[in-house]
């Protein structure tokens, strides 16, 4: 008799994805972050659902409702901080996941990579809208500044911004629609994750060597299920340490002041996970140029498969490319730091140099390194 998990129409799908899935025997801990992102997504949806039960999306009561959740709702404070810091964990895992894909050449699975890019944009949009909901000073001014960037689009820009705002400024209509979008997008993300996995399971996982592992596969369960559970426990440990010991470490003190359209904060800045893109935006003096650079800083990932010049897939055996990859990581950390600094010397110059280096590394230096490595190996 066939095992029910192999014959039942629904269980068969689960079985082929999480139990009997053939997986490479040598994938390292860098491959854990996909499952950790799944854990983050489930946790964000659950905590978000409980927050939505008590939150009101009205400009007069939004700030108070968040305070009410923290003060009066049973364990409301931990749900709120798990949700806020869970977003930070989500982005840490997301950036490591993308970095792993870059390092090991996983971008050659073009469908998986492209769906992943759509996912990245969607998660960023969701996080941005979520930051607006508490209706603090940084929520209001962040929403005003970032949505205003669309006015740089020629001809239709101003109309587009007012259409998004639902009026002539960020107000009640904006907050209500942002709440609606913030609620629906995670479910769209979940559907995209299913598509992402569907495409991944068509080809199978990559591995650190970058060569085919068809001759050496092991079942996903129990080997990688136990490995993923360990990763999830470590993630939850890190998150709980953050939430229970310093929940406001990654937040902005300005967001504890209710939104006031008549009072601009001294330094308007987004959450830490958007600072690298914000630094690129600010490093260009022209508004439209800045907006294009901002979009391209993420959209550039779409061009990476076309820029792959090496005969080898992974960077494991390519020391020049490895050096450039870690320079790129250091550059992104520098941009993140600059994004949080005021617009004054020497930060302006550092930001501009780091922005030029970011695009140069991806568009010029890494493809050239691939060609040089081919020549060295006489390939």
UniProtKB/Swiss-Prot annotation:
Database matches in Gene3D superfamilies: Cytochrome Bc1 Complex, Chain C (1.20.810.10)
Keyword Membrane: yes
Bilayer topology annotation: Multi-pass membrane protein
Source taxon at top rank: Eukaryota
GO cellular component, one term: respiratory chain complex III
Binding residue positions for heme b b562: 83, 182
Keyword annotations of the record: Electron transport, Heme, Iron, Membrane, Metal-binding, Mitochondrion, Mitochondrion inner membrane, Respiratory chain, Transmembrane, Transmembrane helix, Transport, Ubiquinone
GO biological process, one term: mitochondrial electron transport, ubiquinol to cytochrome c
Chief location category: mitochondrion
Membrane-spanning intervals of the chain: 33-53, 77-98, 113-133, 178-198, 226-246, 288-308, 320-340, 347-367
UniProt similarity note: Belongs to the cytochrome b family.
Quaternary structure and interacting proteins, as annotated: The cytochrome bc1 complex contains 11 subunits: 3 respiratory subunits (MT-CYB, CYC1 and UQCRFS1), 2 core proteins (UQCRC1 and UQCRC2) and 6 low-molecular weight proteins (UQCRH/QCR6, UQCRB/QCR7, UQCRQ/QCR8, UQCR10/QCR9, UQCR11/QCR10 and a cleavage product of UQCRFS1). This cytochrome bc1 complex then forms a dimer.
Note, other: Heme 1 (or BL or b562) is low-potential and absorbs at about 562 nm, and heme 2 (or BH or b566) is high-potential and absorbs at about 566 nm.
Named cofactor requirement(s): heme b
PROSITE patterns, per database record: CYTB_CTER, CYTB_NTER
Note on how the cofactor is bound: Binds 2 heme b groups non-covalently.
InterPro entries: Cyt_b/b6_C (IPR005798), Cyt_b/b6_C_sf (IPR036150), Cyt_b/b6_N (IPR005797), Cytb/b6-like_sf (IPR027387), Cytochrome_b (IPR030689), Cytochrome_b_C_euk/bac (IPR048260), Cytochrome_b_N_euk/bac (IPR048259), Di-haem_cyt_TM (IPR016174)
Role of this protein: Component of the ubiquinol-cytochrome c reductase complex (complex III or cytochrome b-c1 complex) that is part of the mitochondrial respiratory chain. The b-c1 complex mediates electron transfer from ubiquinol to cytochrome c. Contributes to the generation of a proton gradient across the mitochondrial membrane that is then used for ATP synthesis.
Protein name: Cytochrome b
Pfam families: Cytochrom_B_C, Cytochrome_B
Record gene name: MT-CYB
Residues the entry annotates as binding heme b b566: 97, 196
Organism: Camelus dromedarius (Dromedary)
Binding site for a ubiquinone: 201
Molecular function via GO: metal ion binding; ubiquinol-cytochrome-c reductase activity
């Amino acid at each position: 008799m066939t095992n029910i998990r192999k014959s039942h129409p629904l269980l068969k799908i689960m079985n082929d994805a999480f139990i009997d899935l053939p997986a490479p025997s040598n994938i390292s801990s860098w491959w854990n972050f996909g499952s950790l992102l799944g854990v983050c997504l489930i946790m964000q949806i659950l905590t978000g659902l409980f927050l939505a039960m008590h939150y009101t999306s009205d400009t007069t009561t939004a700030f108070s409702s968040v305070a009410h959740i923290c003060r009066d709702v049973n364990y409301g404070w931990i749900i709120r901080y798990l949700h806020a810091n869970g977003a930070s964990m989500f982005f840490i895992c997301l950036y490591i996941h993308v970095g792993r894909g870059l390092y090991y050449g996983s971008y050659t699975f073009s469908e998986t990579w492209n769906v992943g890019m759509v996912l990245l944009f969607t998660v960023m949009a969701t996080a941005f809208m979520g930051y607006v909901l508490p209706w603090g000073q940084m929520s209001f001014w962040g929403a005003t500044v970032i949505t205003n960037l669309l006015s740089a689009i020629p001809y239709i820009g101003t109309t587009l911004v007012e259409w998004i705002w639902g009026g002539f400024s960020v107000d009640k209509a904006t907050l209500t629609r942002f709440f609606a979008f913030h609620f629906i997008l995670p479910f769209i993300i979940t559907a995209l994750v299913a598509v992402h996995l569907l495409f991944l399971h068509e080809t199978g996982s990559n591995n650190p060597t970058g060569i085919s592992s068809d001759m050496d596969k092991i079942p996903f369960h129990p080997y990688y299920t136990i490995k993923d559970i360990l990763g999830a426990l470590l993630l939850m440990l890190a998150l709980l340490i953050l939430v229970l010991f310093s929940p406001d470490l990654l937040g902005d003190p300005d967001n504890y002041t209710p939104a006031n359209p008549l009072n601009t904060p001294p330094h308007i800045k987004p959450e830490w996970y958007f600072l690298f893109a914000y630094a690129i935006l600010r490093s260009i003096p022209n508004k439209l140029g800045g907006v294009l650079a901002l979009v391209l800083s993420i959209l550039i990932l779409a061009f990476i498969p076309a820029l792959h010049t090496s005969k080898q897939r992974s960077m494991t055996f390519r020391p020049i490319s490895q050096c450039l990859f870690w320079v790129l990581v250091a550059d992104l950390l520098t941009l993140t730091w600059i994004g949080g600094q005021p617009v004054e010397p020497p930060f302006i110059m550092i930001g501009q140099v780091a922005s030029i280096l970011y695009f140069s590394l991806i568009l010029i230096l890494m493809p050239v390194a691939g060609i040089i490595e081919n020549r060295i190996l006489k390939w």
